[in-house]
Amino acid sequence: MAPKRAKRRTVEGGSSSVFSMFDQTQIQEFKEAFTVIDQNRDGIIDKEDLRDTFAAMGRLNVKNEELDAMMKEASGPINFTVFLTMFGEKLKGADPEDVITGAFKVLDPEGKGTIKKKFLEELLTTQCDRFSQEEIKNMWAAFPPDVGGNVDYKNICYVITHGDAKDQE
């Protein structure tokens, strides 16, 4: 008797379909972000990975309660598929400007609406899809920092999502 062929199961709305929500470039960018957060490179993001990631961004005194709340957003261990699913759920129906602003807010723990030029430049030239010196030069020409060396990220977010600078009233 010949072995039965296994039927392919499809899960509608399940985690296996999360890969269809994003194109290959986006998935690769999420993979790079996952790798940056997975500090110990074990393929799972845990509380210590989050703590180390915050420390790398200069935020040293993150409370356990805050980390626990982040970990509870997942139903179990956070591997790449779970990570992608979590982002897919958060991004579904979200305003792109709000999503991008939210990403910048992570880098602005004091909620000032600005990020230090030096810190942003370091991130953009050393992490994931690295900016060239020419791209950095163009960015500062388009979004010059203030006299204190701070960059208004809300204007950057607006331009990314709308293609033109906000009118200063």
From Swiss-Prot:
Residues annotated as domain EF-hand: 25-60, 95-130, 131-166
Keyword field: Calcium, Disease variant, Metal-binding, Methylation, Motor protein, Muscle protein, Myosin, Phosphoprotein, Repeat
Any one GO molecular function term: calcium ion binding
Phosphoserine: residues bearing it: S15, S16, S75
Sites where the protein binds Ca(2+): D38, N40, D42, D49
Modified residues (N,N,N-trimethylalanine): A2
UniProt cross-references to InterPro entries, sorted A to Z: EF-hand-dom_pair, EF_Hand_1_Ca_BS, EF_hand_dom, Myosin_RLC
PANTHER family in UniProt: MYOSIN REGULATORY LIGHT CHAIN 2
Assembly, per entry: Myosin is a hexamer of 2 heavy chains and 4 light chains.
The name this protein goes by in its record: Myosin regulatory light chain 11
Biological source species: Homo sapiens (Human)
